[in-house]
Amino acid sequence: MPSCGKIATLTAPVPAPITENKPLHVVSIGGGTGLSALLAGLKRYARGVHGEPVEGAYEVDITAVVTVTDDGGSSGRLRRDLDILPPGDIRSCMVALSEDEGLLSRLFQYRFHSGHGLKGHSFGNLFLAALNQITGDFAHAVRLSSEILAIRGRIFPSTASNVTLEARLADGKMVAGESKISQSRQAIDRIFLRPAGCRPLRETLEAIERADVITLGPGSLYTSVIPNLLVTGIP
């Protein structure tokens, strides 16, 4: 398992000049609010779902790879109750890339403020959970939801495995769970995924292979960025 004590610098060949027929293939890896904010900015340079041209001289083709270690709030409850991947970060990324910035996006972000069993859940999380139950495939549920929201790009969970983030702190103590790691005041010595050896989706590896640009973050280094890099084959 790679140590998280040092941060590697990723380098890649300078991409070829953007042409009208060749968009810049961008793969954005991360999670949390940082990734969704980045995607909202990139969206303006992505062609519409019906082929509408972009404004300006640049066009990008967007793939988002989203961490699936969240275990707090609505996502954590759904993980524990339904044994599914946490939907929250993926939901936020879908809304960020959606062409619909009106009622439908507001609906997916709506969070229930009352109701036994409903309080704290967002509609979009419940929608993804229901589609996962229907299809039996979380990645397929994400694709179907993305079509409904008419997103400008593709979104993949970093792995289809239901993994737990663990950290070894500087004092040697082990902490399990993203939410507990975030609350820890001790320096982090190393980060792990359990079970180890989880694999990414085939589509994720294909997107990385053809990428002109790969972005990491912005977001929490240990809980939003590095967990993706612990999945075998990413990047």
Q: Regions from the language model: what does each represent?
A:
Residues G31-G34, T69-D70:
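Short polar catalytic/cofactor-binding loops
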Residues P2-V26, T33-A64, L126-T215, S220-P235:
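Conserved catalytic alpha/beta core of Sir2/sirtuin-type deacylases, generalized to analogous enzyme cores
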